[in-house]
């Protein structure tokens, strides 16, 4: 029979010399296999962190040019695993993890491999959208402004 006392696993040793005695097993261990959706597995995390740094440096200029809020839902196996927001409408711009704090003008639902190909310039965004590789809701034409932001970031 298992009992948990003081956050350490203990087992009742019924066949020991003294009935009712507890044997300490030691502290619990971390699972041998990491969580399947750990942040280190995603290539988009460092990309968005770098984009965030870029927005901090030139955000006020981008706000004047773009004037929109973009939410990007990054998916894996059809499930959203990350949400990022690029706010180029308010203040001097901001990029943060999570859903848009204010209503997003455009929401992209995009698989991570497709996003990485778009960011690296290996795939044309218009052709990918028309081929159904990702979904866009809201003001679809603002996607062209986001494409320019990504190209500007790539040169940075």
Curated annotation (Swiss-Prot):
Residues 44-156 form the SCP2 domain. GO terms for cellular component: cytosol. InterPro entries: SCP2_sterol-bd_dom (IPR003033), SCP2_sterol-bd_dom_sf (IPR036527). Pfam families: SCP2 (PF02036). Gene3D superfamilies: SCP2 sterol-binding domain (3.30.1050.10). It comes from the Eukaryota. SUPFAM superfamilies: SCP-like (SSF55718). This is SCP2 sterol-binding domain-containing protein 1. It comes from Bos taurus.
């Amino acid at each position: 029979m298992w009992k948990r006392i003081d956050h350490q696993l203990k087992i009742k040793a019924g066949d020991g010399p003294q009935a009712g005695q507890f044997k300490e097993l030691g502290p619990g261990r971390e699972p041998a296999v990491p969580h399947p959706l750990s942040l280190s597995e995603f290539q988009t995390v460092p990309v968005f962190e770098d984009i965030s740094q870029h927005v901090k440096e030139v955000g006020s200029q981008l706000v004047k040019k773009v004037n929109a809020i973009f939410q990007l839902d990054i998916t894996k196996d059809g499930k959203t695993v990350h949400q990022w927001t690029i706010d180029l409408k308010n203040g001097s711009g901001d990029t943060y993890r999570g859903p848009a704090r204010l209503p997003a003008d455009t929401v992209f639902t995009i698989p991570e491999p497709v996003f990485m190909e778009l960011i690296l310039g290996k795939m044309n965004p218009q052709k990918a959208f028309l081929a159904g590789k990702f979904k866009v809701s809201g003001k679809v034409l603002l996607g062209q402004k986001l494409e320019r932001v990504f190209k500007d970031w790539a040169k940075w």
